[in-house]
Structures are given as structure tokens and as C-alpha cells.
Amino acid sequence: MIDHFIMNKLPLELVYYLTNWLKDYDKRMLLSTCKNFLSLQSCVYYEDIYYYEEIHKLSYHQMFRKVELELCKFKTPIPKIVTNLEFDVYFNEPLINRRIKIRNKWVKIRKIIPSTVKYLDMGYSFNKSIRGALSYGLTTLIFGPEFNQPIDNYIPQTVTYLEFSVYFDQPVVGYLPTRLTHLIFGTDFNQPIKGALPDTLEYLYFGWAFNQPIDFALPPNLKCLKFGHCFDQPIKGFLPLGLEKLIFEAEYHQPMDLAIPESVEYLKLGNPGSNSLENCLPINLKTLVFGENFNENLNTLSLDKFRELEKIEFDGFFDQKISSRITIDNVIKSNNFIETFQNFYGMIKYYFNDFINPNRQYLPENVKHIIISTYLYDKICSNISNDVFIEVYN
């Protein structure tokens, strides 16, 4: 049992210091051990996510950094100490000039979102103007699928992470924050980007519909670049020389020979079209992923010169024999193999839909791990060696 006399003798400075190392629940337990400690409640921050209705009547409600506020009860001010704010799936209310209740009086305030907020997730349904609603100091801004409003110069320059979702398709040239490091566009975005992207940008993801020219449009510090299913614009001479990760989600029909910088270590190809695959690959490549549309014969592919290559992954419906010439010691994730393959350690998942004949060597002896569905488990488990670990998913 705690000796309350001894606890009361502890310096408050020491107790305050100890709370920095405790989880929220333990903080509350410690501060409730004696009356003397209760004075620290208004000095200690709480980091977990709390429902607004649970904490707004507490005398120290301003010490909760992360508050979840239900739309139907959005009638009182959001605490000005909140740093992380996420709206729920139904929220679609104006962010400025809103009437709220303060001390039993209805008043009109210009901004709903406190200037203390650093992380803001607008939720699924939000699709209102953001003009004048966001404060300087915001660093992370995430819009949900329904948002498709002009951004003009409404996003603070302090934002470093910006994410748009499904329906956003508005002009961005001249409107993006100059400190951005991460920029994600959703499914429908297909606007010009030349002159739009800041030099600080390191991660850039385009969605399904994007198919705009990228000539001299990409910033020099870009490290990761992802193109969606519709992209089919020239890239030769336009990719940053320091690029490390490049993703094509679908077929690409533009010339690729020597177009990808040697700095690229991770490359995903949906389908290189008429391009020579061997001439597409950068010399320092470590991971090569073939996308869902790739089903080309690899018998002519020589990987001897790619000495850094560690991993090959087939991410779709690949269904070809793999030549014994490809003998690198790596991991291959193959989704749809029906043919035999040799000299590889690998995993089979998702679309495999064939019986494994126990009288025929379908799997190399060094395969140790297979991922299959519950549906297939009963079909094939009895024909697989007991040395192979079988992981089952629904």
C-alpha cells in the first residue's frame, strides 16, 4: 500500500518530471494518489486520443493534445491547446463564420480550427471552402475522398505533408506550400504541374487519372515518385538524378531506354510495353517489382550485370516459366504461378488457383513459406512438405 505521508513529501518538481515518462493512465493514477499532486493536473499534457464530450468539462481540459469531436455535438469551441485534430466521416460543416455556444451564449467566430493545430485530417465527407480557415503553423493536412474545392493560396506555407484523395481535381500551380516534402494526389487529379512543385519536395504520388507532361516539372530533391494507371508521358531526361524509388502502376508505352536514373534502387513496372526490359533497368537496382499487368517471357533477360539486385517481386497475374539463367539469390513473391520454377526462394499468394501434384516437383526444395487462402488450404495442404510453413488468410 502506498504511504501517503511519504508521497506528500515528494517535491512536485520530481513528480512532474516523472510524468514525462508515463502513459496517460499512469499519469492520472500518480496524480490521484494524494491531494498535493492534484495541482499538477493543469501542468501535465495528455497524449492519447480522447472524446471531447469526456473531457471538455474538466478544469484541465486544455491539457489534452488529441481530442475527437463528434459532429452532432460540435457546438462548443475546440480547446486551443489541441495539436492533432481529426474530423469524423460525416463532418461537412463550414470552417469559418460559424455560430457556437460559449458560456451559454451563441457567438459567431471566424475560425473553428485553433491555431495550435499541427496535424489536421478533414475526414471522409468534408467538401467546404478552406479560405481563411487554416492557420500558420499547420504541418500536416489530409483531405478525404469528397474534397474538391479550390486551394488557391489557402494552405499555410508551414505545411510539409499534404494529401488529397479521390475527387480532388483543382489547379495547383502557384498554390502549393513552399516547404512541402510529401505530396499525394488522389484518383481524379489530372492538372498541369509544371511550375507547381517546390524544390523541397521528396515524395510525390500521382493517382489513377494523372496524365500530364512532366518535362522540367519535377523538383531536384525528389526521392520517391509514383505514377498511376493512366500515365503515359515521356520521362527521358525529366527524372531527377537523385531519384531512389520509381513506380509505374500500369502499362507504359513511351521510350524507357536509359531513361531511369542510375540512382534508382526500387523500380516497379506495370508493363514496359515495347521497351527492352534489360535496357530499362538502372545499374544500381536493388528491388524490381513487376506489376499486375506484367506477363512477359523473361527467358532472354540477363541480370548478371545488376550486382546490387536483391529482390524480384511479381505483383499481379504473372504466369510464365522462369529461365534457369535467372539465378540470383533473392526473394521472389509470385502471385499466379502455375508453371514450375527453379533456383528461387519464394512465396505464393493471392491468385494461385491450381492443385499441387505430390508426384511432380512444383516447388523448389528451399521454399519455406507459402501464403494461401482458406479456400485453397484443404486442396493442397496434404501435398506440401511438412517442412514448409503454410500461412492461411481469409
From Swiss-Prot:
The entry's keywords: Repeat
Thylakoid keyword on record: no
Cross-referenced InterPro entries: FNIP, LRR_dom_sf, STK_FNIP-Repeat
FNIP repeat segments: 126-167, 168-207, 210-250
Domain of life: Viruses
Pfam families given in the database record: FNIP (PF05725)
Disulfide bonds: none
Listed PANTHER family: FNIP REPEAT-CONTAINING PROTEIN
Name of the protein in its database record: Putative FNIP repeat-containing protein R636
Species in which this protein is naturally found: Acanthamoeba polyphaga mimivirus
